[in-house]
Amino acid sequence: MLFTVSCSKMSSIVDRDDSSIFDGLVEEDDKDKAKRVSRNKSEKKRRDQFNVLIKELGSMLPGNARKMDKSTVLQKSIDFLRKHKEITAQSDASEIRQDWKPTFLSNEEFTQLMLEALDGFFLAIMTDGSIIYVSESVTSLLEHLPSDLVDQSVFNFIPEGEHSEVYKILSTHLLESDSLTPEYLKSKNQLEFCCHMLRGTVDPKEPSTYEYVRFIGNFKSLNSVPTSAHNGFEGTIQRTHRPSYEDRVCFVATVRLATPQFIKEMCTVEEPNEEFTSRHSLEWKFLFLDHRAPPIIGYLPFEVLGTSGYDYYHVDDLENLAKCHEHLMQYGKGKSCYYRFLTKGQQWIWLQTHYYITYHQWNSRPEFIVCTHTVVSYAEVRAERRRELGIEESLPDAAADKSQDSGSDNRINTVSLKEALERFDHSPTPSASSRSSRKSSHTAVSDPSSTPTKIPTDTSTPPRQHLPAHEKMAQRRSSFSSQSMNSQSVGPSLTQPVMSQAANLPVPQGMSQFQFSAQLGAMQHLKDQLEQRTRMIEANIHRQQEELRKIQEQLQMVHGQGLQMFLQQSNPGLNFGSVQLSSGNSSNIQQLTPINMQGQVVPTNQIQSGMNAGHIGTSQHLIQQQSLQSTSTQQSQQSVMSGHSQQTSLASQTQSTLTAPLYNTMVISQPAPGSMVQIPSSMPQNSTQSATVTTFTQDRQIRFSQGQQLVTKLVTAPVACGAVMVPSTMLMGQVVTAYPTFATQQQQAQTLSVTQQQPQQQQPQQQQPQQQQPQQQQQSSQEQQLPSVPQPSQAQLTQSPQQFLQTSRLLHGNPSTQLILSAAFPLQQSTFPPSHHQQHQSQQQQQLSRHRTDSLTDPSKVQPQ
């Protein structure tokens, strides 16, 4: 019984274990399933995103429109990136990195600008004469469209008499040893020669006109063209030139007109249908110009307003324009013919205008004419004129076949020279030609009809001679008249027969070919010319800088008053007013002698003549002084001579108000003959110090016993009422003058008062160093032996803004009269300390003068105003 119970218990336990294990397995399966679902979702999301990227990448790839698989899309993308990397490397290798090339211009823009400046164009021809590239500038020089020349033989545009010589020149690179000997080879593969080229015309039936041109270039092997660009090259050169082009050599040259032109046409337009508006009066004068006009014609609105529109039109178009304007006045609106407009860059641009007349809203009278000008290309103009002549305009067959065979718009005239020779791909990359030149106002260049050369189309081969040419050249405002010019001598007579079908001549096989560098010889020649031009420009810049420096120096001298205004703002000036002079007499002055001051001799007769005119000539010394700080900031001063002179009038027997800047040197009278006035002005360091002792020695010199001093020039001349003292508060210190002989001529005392205006802001004065106190005490003891002058206290100086120096009496005596004057002219800041040598010298002078002086009475008193 017990066994049965235990067995039942064990079986129940086993059942529970099995159920728990099953439940655990189910839970694990659920977890794994959830993980798989999540993983599948993320994988599907990743695949969808990858497919979207592949589809987007495939849509960006050029070529087939059919659906491509993923591997094809990736392969084409890799090929494109590899080709792009190669092209970038080639572009960087051929980039012009010299200093003479502006950094803001690309190679194409720089090349086009240089060609326009040189009156030339690029031409790439095969050795058999087939033209594979021509730059757009050929239109403005020879009136040919690039499409007229490409895939044509160069011999079709050269006189028959010159075919043999040109063919011989183009074939020189095929010779083994004799190829470097001809005279037209400059260096290695570079050559230069001259010939005539046919000028394009609107009417092919017109007589042929040739221009004398110069070819400068070198040969370039087409083996250097990358393999990835061969397909593009096959689309560029046509039909018969495709086989064995790897073994061919082309001649790349810069073709320049032998005779430069003055004004040339601007014939290419990168952005068609460019337009701008203007308003004209009924007399066809400009009243308004649109903001879109300056980038096109170069003129700003204010440059053309008020001028007649006929001033900018080509003389050959005036007759047709006059008819169009007559039609406008009759019908009120209309469209003009194609005409040429002279831009600010002295180039002709083709325009067509739609215009109408606006009427006043009240009286219905004509008010002005509104014009909308549209820029057109020379190709449109030529096609329109040929249609008027009944000539069917058609592109060359080769060009038409080329566009059909290549299957893309790879116009050779818009492909740069580098692409035509190195990449030859399908994508057109227009060179920056007309727009850059049209928007830049460069100087005059040429007129397309200036120097044509008439050459008769004869089957014979006569020797080349001077070829006369006569054609009228229109210039703006009729400033240039018609000119007749003779072309240059072409050279020796032709020695070989004419080869009219040079394009069909076979090229020998197996001949050696030269491997040339990527740098074109034409660009090297252009570089040399630009370097020479750069040196000339630099010389002009240096000369202009030197002239500018001289002008600035003169302006600094002329505009010295600006510095004076700065000093008057930063430092207070001096105001000398109420110069009181007692009754004087100038009739006793009999003789004037030169005055020697500071080592300078001033003739007093010249000063006398100036005083008779009632003026005192003052020469200005400009002093540049920095603001004095409250701390120990040193003063800096600089004297600059000025070309101006200041006239100050003094009237005798009256009061005069003298306002002088800090740098004035007054001219004051001195009647004594042979007198020499030496006026060193001291700078006291404290306003409470004793006054300066002034002595007059036997040699009639004024000397001061102060230490280190600033010497003030005081040139004297006779004046009727005494002397005028002009001190300089900031720099000059005390200024005293004396007249030993003038006192003998007067019977009553004279009073001399000088007003000094104190600064508006009184800076705290620095104390004198301790080592200078014994010297001051010694000086004070010496001054006590003589009649002293009382000095006002510090409180008096601060309360009264002006101080006076009065001399109450001048005693009569011998010429060595001693005069003690005190001038209380305190400074803002600490002044220069007195030197020991000067103080010792002053003491000796005082001791010497003590034996020679007379008694003095009533020392001068300083009284506040």
Curated annotation (Swiss-Prot):
Induction: Exhibits no circadian rhythm expression. Residues 107-177, 262-332 form the PAS domain. Residues 34-84 form the bHLH domain. Residues 450-570 are annotated as: Interaction with SIRT1. Residues 447-463, 856-865 have a biased composition (Polar residues). One of its GO terms (molecular function) is histone acetyltransferase activity. The modification Phosphoserine is found at S38, S42, S408, S427, S431. The record marks H84 as: Important for interaction with BMAL1. This is Circadian locomoter output cycles protein kaput. It comes from Nannospalax galili (Northern Israeli blind subterranean mole rat). The lineage of its organism: Eukaryota, Metazoa, Chordata, Craniata, Vertebrata. The gene is Clock.
